[in-house]
Amino acid sequence: MVTHIVFWRFLDEANGQDREANMERVSSALQALPALIPEIETLEVGRDFNRSGAAFDLALYTRFASREHLATYQAHPEHQKVKDLVVAVVAETAVVDYES
């Protein structure tokens, strides 16, 4: 299995909306992806509740059967649409991919 985890720190305001509205838009868009991309085995989206200075705002946890399935997901047009939305509203991104 391949696990793909992404963390985002959102801008205070972007695209005419505040941080909370943009987090909701991104979260909803991500949660719609499993119905559109069959290679996704597991997808969870979570908001940070601790709000420490080192914390990111939103996390994505996904699992795939193989590296090839991850690559298919990353190249999928629906994923690209969400990625375009994310790039416009986040200040920082951290990613890790690993096999287990």
Identify the function of each model-found stretch.
Residues M1-F56, A65-A71, E99-S100:
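Short S/T/G/P-rich N-terminal loop/turn motif that feeds into the first structured element of a domain
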Residues F64-A94:
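C-terminal structural segments of small proteins and small subunits
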